[in-house]
């Protein structure tokens, strides 16, 4: 029998997402095959991911379909512009 292990990831929120959610970070336990999008849905089931939100895993841009590993840091942030 194959059993999914449970992992813990750290979640960080930046800029307007941090303000909207009222917190800067979370810790979340997930199964081995969990994606970045599933993390958001698990933490915020009543709050859809805002359009154009970017994600990073371990400080590198990531797609919402990327799976995470134990101990990963997942960050969500709005698009960044500058001048």
Language model: regions and residue ranges:
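Ubiquitin-like/PB1-type beta-grasp interaction modules and other compact soluble beta-rich domains
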Residues: 1-82
């Amino acid at each position: 029998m194959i059993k999914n292990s449970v992992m813990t990831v750290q979640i960080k929120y930046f800029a307007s997402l941090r303000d909207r959610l009222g917190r800067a970070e979370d810790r979340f336990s997930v199964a081995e095959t969990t994606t970045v999008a599933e993390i958001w849905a698990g933490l915020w089931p009543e709050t859809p991911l805002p359009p154009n939100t970017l994600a990073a895993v371990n400080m590198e841009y990531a797609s919402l379909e990327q799976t995470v590993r134990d101990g990963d840091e997942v960050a969500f942030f709005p698009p960044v512009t500058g001048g």
